Amino acid sequence: MRVIPVSTGKASTPTPIFDTKVFTKYRAVTLRGRTYTVPGVPYTICVSANEAICMHAAPWQENAGKAFGVPRSNGCVRIPLAHARWLFENTPKGTPVSIQA
């Protein structure tokens, strides 16, 4: 078992609670939303078929000294870089994922 600190969606953009699986993986990808574009997001694992909800590294959060474990995202699950890399390398497509409160 591995415990990984994460940051999920803010109250205004909550992360959905659901059972799913890994659909797609990107070593680096540009994430886009209505109010943001973030290029080069590393170790991205998408857990919704439309790629709207993903788990990914958030180096900008680490670089700003903002702790994980606090809701900060626009719906995705943000993970510290080292943990995101481990998860990316050890989670094949099709792996079951359960996102809980």
Language model regions located:
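A structural motif detector for short, solvent-exposed N-terminal "entry" segments of globular domains
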Residues: 1-12
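Exported/periplasmic cell-wall-interacting domains
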Residues: 13-19, 24-101
